[in-house]
């Protein structure tokens, strides 16, 4: 069975939140591994918006599947392979029914969007 999640985020909204709440926002939404990437590579609001949209889309797919009742954003890590392709890692949560988890992220300077396919 396949489940999908989709999300779109205004980059300006994430920029405002990041500017106002910087570390609080990062610590509430992103894992330690994700925060390290943001800080080491000096990533901007466009990058954060894409990752945030991917987390939202992943959460929607997971919740619609019924395999979880709730999941935190920090538990959904959006990381990148060496070739730059994004992937989802559930930060140590083992969901035995998950066969595959695919994510695609796109953005402009105005919007970021993500689409996720969860296969059980």
Residue ranges and their predicted role:
Residues 1-120:
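Core catalytic alpha/beta fold that binds nucleotide/phospho-ligands
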